[in-house]
Amino acid sequence: MKRTFQPSNRKRKNKHGFRERMATANGRRVLASRRAKGRKKLTVSDEYNGK
């Protein structure tokens, strides 16, 4: 049986990345609450320092 978690960095960034969060009002609320809480990483995009 195939497992449910099949990791893919592209899917991860597209679904939970910074630009995706900024695209909706609720996503911006997520970012605001994470900023308020003082999270080091706001989104999964912050784990990468590529392009």
From Swiss-Prot:
Q: Which GO terms describe its molecular function?
A: structural constituent of ribosome
Record carries keyword Ribosomal protein = yes
What ranges does the record give for the region Disordered, renumbered to this chain?
A: 1-51
Report which superkingdom the organism of origin falls in.
Bacteria
Q: Which InterPro entries match?
A: Ribosomal_bL34, Ribosomal_bL34_CS
Answer whether the UniProt record assigns the keyword Ribonucleoprotein to this protein.
Answer: yes
**Start-end of Basic residues biased regions:** 1-16, 31-42
Give the matching PANTHER family: LARGE RIBOSOMAL SUBUNIT PROTEIN BL34M, MITOCHONDRIAL RIBOSOMAL PROTEIN 34 FAMILY MEMBER
Similarity comment text for this entry: Belongs to the bacterial ribosomal protein bL34 family.
- Recorded protein name is Large ribosomal subunit protein bL34
Give the organism, scientific name. Phocaeicola vulgatus (strain ATCC 8482 / DSM 1447 / JCM 5826 / CCUG 4940 / NBRC 14291 / NCTC 11154)
